């Protein structure tokens, strides 16, 4: 017989909460909690906008992938073309006589926002920047970045060069997860290739100047795009990724980014809804040496919830009972369905906490008697 038992999760020690809403001045924004895969804010997040130098993250990703599959190494030297040398905007001040390593170029793209470095990488990997941009677009689509189209490697203003804030956030997540051996470069404060750019040697990311756990990733600015930032910060067991675009000044970018990081960490906290191994319900056992067995969650269920205010959460236990012996510890016997207003329902397998051996003849007769007695009692109570 299918058993359904409703629980108040407050009895297990937690509650649902209401967060204080945050209104950002950014034209578009995306804020994400990595551990719980929770989007905390999305404002025009899927709309493609000019990304400016934030799109260099895709060029950097392509370089990291090329190193991962052995096409190049950090020590590989690359040729600087006239086109690369003539790039305007932020540069490493490369010239045709240079043979910068891939390591130099990656630092130049991340820290100096070097447009020349992007062209060198593009030509080194694909022959031309145009061919490389086409590869970037194709690769982005394969990675699930549905709203990204690239016309060049640097983010230089070009018709049709677009990325959404969500895509930039997903790209940041990939760089963090897939390339930990290189990710520390994003927190590097300065880089000056051959002592040529003392005024352009500092990382522009304003979050790196603050004591908030920031460790990346990239700023961007053009007249059309406004001021933007892809950032990430770690506090305790949590990592936040944020993407902002379309702000009016460097000061606004820095202020909004700091506010969003603080909001994400202070207004939300990790809560364990149910802990693995904690008895949730005692299920009747049929023909066992014991008359019941505890059902426990197979794993912890942790959710990121707003950290102020409170209201109840409910759960439903579902299992087929009585459960016939023998029963092995860890056997899946039911499920726990957790329901929180505003969140998707979570289903957790319930497993037997202990073994229950099959009983002998007398034990079986005792079990039959006890179960009949229990059902008779419940029937009389219902009347």
Language-model segments: which ranges?
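Domain-terminus/edge residues, biased toward the C-terminal soluble/receptor-binding domains
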Residues: 145-149, 157-383
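Active-site-adjacent loops and short helices of periplasmic peptidoglycan-processing enzymes
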Residues: 19-180, 191
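Bacterial N-terminal signal peptides
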Residues: 4-15
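Residue-level detector of intrinsically disordered, flexible termini
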Residues: 16-20, 314
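Sterically constrained small-residue positions within well-ordered secondary structures
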Residues: 10-12, 20-22, 42, 233, ...
């Amino acid at each position: 017989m299918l058993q359904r038992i409703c629980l108040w999760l407050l009895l297990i020690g937690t509650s649902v909460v209401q967060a204080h809403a945050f209104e950002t001045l950014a034209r578009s924004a995306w804020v994400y909690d990595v551990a719980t895969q929770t989007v905390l804010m999305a404002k025009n997040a899927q709309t493609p906008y000019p990304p400016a130098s934030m799109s260099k993250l895709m060029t950097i990703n392509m370089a990291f992938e090329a190193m991962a599959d052995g096409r190049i190494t950090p020590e590989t030297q690359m040729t600087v073309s006239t086109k690369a040398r003539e790039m305007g905007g932020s540069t490493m001040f490369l010239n045709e006589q240079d043979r910068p390593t891939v390591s130099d170029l990656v630092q130049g793209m991340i820290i100096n926002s070097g447009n020349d470095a992007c062209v060198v990488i593009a030509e080194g990997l694909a022959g031309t920047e145009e061919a490389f941009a086409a590869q970037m677009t194709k690769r982005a689509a394969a990675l699930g970045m549905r709203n990204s189209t690239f016309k060049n490697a640097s983010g230089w203003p070009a018709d049709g060069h677009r990325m959404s804030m969500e895509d930039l956030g997903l790209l940041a997540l990939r760089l963090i997860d897939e390339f930990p051996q290189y990710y520390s470069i994003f927190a590097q404060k300065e880089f000056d290739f051959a002592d040529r750019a003392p005024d352009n040697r500092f990382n522009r990311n304003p979050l790196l100047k603050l004591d908030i756990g920031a460790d990346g990733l990239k700023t961007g600015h053009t007249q059309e795009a406004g001021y933007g930032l892809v950032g990430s910060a770690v506090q305790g067991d949590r990592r936040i990724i944020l993407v902002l675009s379309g702000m009016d000044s460097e000061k606004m970018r820095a202020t909004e980014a700091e506010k969003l990081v603080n909001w994400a960490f202070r207004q939300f906290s990790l809560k364990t809804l149910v802990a693995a191994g904690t008895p949730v319900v005692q299920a009747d056992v049929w023909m066992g040496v014991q008359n019941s067995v505890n059902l426990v969650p197979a794993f912890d269920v942790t959710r990121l919830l707003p950290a102020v205010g409170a209201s109840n959460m409910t759960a439903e236990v579902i299992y087929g009972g009585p459960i016939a012996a023998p029963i092995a510890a860890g056997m899946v016997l039911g499920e726990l369905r957790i329901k929180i207003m505003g969140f998707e329902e979570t289903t957790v397998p319930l497993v037997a906490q202990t073994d229950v051996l099959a009983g002998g003849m007398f034990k079986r007769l005792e079990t039959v008697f006890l179960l009949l007695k229990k059902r008779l009692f419940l029937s009389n109570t219902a009347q």
